Amino acid sequence: MFNVRVNVTLACTECGDRNYITTKNKRNNPERIEMKKYCPRLNKYTLHRETK
């Protein structure tokens, strides 16, 4: 059975730190994901985007 879920890294758009690792289903979400998450370096919530 082929596993569709893959691990992705989320990077802060303001400072560039890669703060989070999560999984996504490539079949349901083929585009890159974006989430508002907490950035410990900036001490605030910022937009985090999926990186390669």
From Swiss-Prot:
GO terms for molecular function: structural constituent of ribosome. The keyword Ribosomal protein applies. The keyword Lipid biosynthesis does not apply. InterPro entries: Ribosomal_bL33, Ribosomal_bL33_CS, Ribosomal_bL33_sf, Ribosomal_zn-bd. Gene3D superfamilies: Ribosomal protein L33. One of its GO terms (biological process) is translation. Transmembrane segments: none annotated. GO terms for cellular component: cytoplasm; ribonucleoprotein complex; ribosome. Pfam families: Ribosomal_L33. Belongs to the bacterial ribosomal protein bL33 family. This is Large ribosomal subunit protein bL33B. It comes from Staphylococcus aureus (strain USA300 / TCH1516). The gene is rpmG2.
